[in-house]
């Protein structure tokens, strides 16, 4: 371990988070973390990308997983020539495959840049604006809630209890006239 970096058991190089670097109570190496039964924190920017399973959380299983059979189907008794069916299958599959690759090559990096900026702004606003506003509101509303609670218990509770006692002796009887 040198210069704020360490290597895990698989040989991956990780940076030590800034918060962890100066804290003597938190271990910076795996052996010490295991010894103290603490979870090792990894830097999110150095994790590996799985090039085989590109949708590990199954976000697009039901949306864009469209095959030839999902789009084009010939019912029994209405079949085209076998050669046409095979050529249609090949044309559809190859066109979809290469056109997707072309679109992702042209627009993938710009779209990743746009979405990265968007989610960075969204995260920034959530961390630095939304959560502090909500916390501030909860602190301010706490004093109002105490006053409101006192008002309910001293004014509304006795009032509605008295109204309830007044109407508790009211009896309604329904008779059907023939």
Curated annotation (Swiss-Prot):
Source species: Aotus nancymaae (Ma's night monkey)
Similarity comment: family membership: Belongs to the caveolin family.
Superkingdom of origin: Eukaryota
Post-translational modification Phosphoserine, affected residues: 2, 9, 37
Subunit structure, as described in the record: Homooligomer. Interacts with GLIPR2. Interacts with NOSTRIN. Interacts with SNAP25 and STX1A. Interacts (via the N-terminus) with DPP4; the interaction is direct. Interacts with CTNNB1, CDH1 and JUP. Interacts with PACSIN2; this interaction induces membrane tubulation. Interacts with SLC7A9. Interacts with BMX and BTK. Interacts with TGFBR1. Interacts with CAVIN3 (via leucine-zipper domain) in a cholesterol-sensitive manner. Interacts with CAVIN1. Interacts with EHD2 in a cholesterol-dependent manner.
Protein name as annotated: Caveolin-1
Residues modified to N6-acetyllysine: 5
Lipidation (S-palmitoyl cysteine): 133, 143, 156
């Amino acid at each position: 371990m040198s210069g704020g970096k360490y290597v895990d058991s698989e040989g991956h190089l990780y940076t030590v988070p800034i918060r962890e670097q100066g804290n003597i109570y938190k271990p910076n190496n795996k052996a010490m973390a295991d010894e103290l039964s603490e979870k090792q924190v990894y830097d999110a920017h150095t994790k590996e990308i799985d090039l085989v399973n590109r949708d590990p959380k199954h976000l697009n299983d039901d949306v864009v997983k469209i095959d030839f059979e999902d789009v084009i189907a010939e019912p029994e008794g209405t079949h085209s020539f076998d050669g046409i069916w095979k050529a249609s299958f090949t044309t559809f599959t190859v066109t979809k495959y290469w056109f997707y690759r072309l679109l992702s090559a042209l627009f993938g990096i710009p779209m990743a840049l746009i979405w990265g900026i968007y989610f960075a702004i969204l995260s920034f606003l959530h961390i630095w604006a939304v959560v502090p506003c909500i916390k501030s509101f909860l602190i301010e509303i706490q004093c109002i809630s105490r006053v409101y609670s006192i008002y309910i218990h001293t004014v509304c509770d006795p009032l509605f209890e008295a109204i309830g006692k007044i109407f508790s002796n009211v009896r309604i009887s329904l008779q059907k006239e023939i």
